[in-house]
Amino acid sequence: MSSTQKLIKYVAVLFGLLLSFSIIFSIVEGIGGIFRALINTDNSTFETRVISEDFNDTINDIDIDLSSSNLIIKKGDKVLVESNSKSVKYKIDGTTLKIKDSKSSLINGTDSSVIVYIPDDVKLDKLNIDIGAGYLTAESVNVKKLDLNLGAGSTTIDNLISDDTDIDTGAGSFTINSGSISNLDLDIGVGRTVITAGINGNSSIDTGIGSLTLNLPNSGFYTFDVDKGLGRVIINDDEIFNDKIVGDGINTIKLSGGIGDIIVSFDK
């Protein structure tokens, strides 16, 4: 695909995304205003409630699907779920904890939040998170298989350890401050992505419209397969102008560029 074709493709994608967000936002705001006027919701009546104090059975997997609620993951002595919203429900399916909010949380006028506490010594088999308009913050995540599907809100993860990692970012910013991430498949949307962590195994990153900053350990650990787009690609202070292989490390990262810049730096 030529540079001109790439430009047309990404401009069309960006225009489509902006138009879609504008239409959806207008519809949601309009419906929300009607419902709030009809039900006259009083946010002060909502108090934090523990929807499950403890889970007697072993929880190996957690599946979270939130349309508009914020998600906060914290360290705790046991698996615990809290929410300030009546729209948030949970159930246990075998060894899987499932958490979901209803679509009405988009229009009920509340700032809905879910807090999930996970012991620091617990490594989950699977963690699936699908989040829409809300933000996500996590102190620590330790999991074999991670699947993140993010929407308009920002995401910050202080420490991430994962063996198999699939992340789709949306319009919000995405930040990982530390950790060890293996076999990463990352698709970046519109927002800015910053990852400060080791990335191990065979990984693939598609920047699309958003920008990417990687802060990695020693450069000798990595091989980069660069498919340059319209944005700049800078690896260890050297700008890459063409598609090429950079480095000869054991860990491979395929970088597919788009409109946004890609900047890779290393610990000195």
Pin down the residues of each PLM region.
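Hydrophobic membrane-insertion alpha-helices, especially the h-region
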Residues: 10-29
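Acidic/proline-rich low-complexity IDRs
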Residues: 6, 16-20, 33, 37, ...
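N-terminal Lys/Arg-rich, disordered targeting/topogenic segments
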Residues: 1-7
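Short, surface-exposed interaction patches in beta-rich subdomains
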Residues: 158-160, 164-169, 173-268
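Extracellular repeat turn/loop positions enriched in glycine and acidic/polar residues, especially those
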Residues: 121, 130, 149, 168, ...
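A short hydrophobic/aromatic micro-motif that marks alpha-helical segments and, especially, helix-coil
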Residues: 83-84, 148, 167, 186
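Short linear S-[DN]-x-LW-Φ motif typified by the pepsin-like aspartic protease active-site region
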Residues: 29-102, 107-130, 135-141, 145, ...
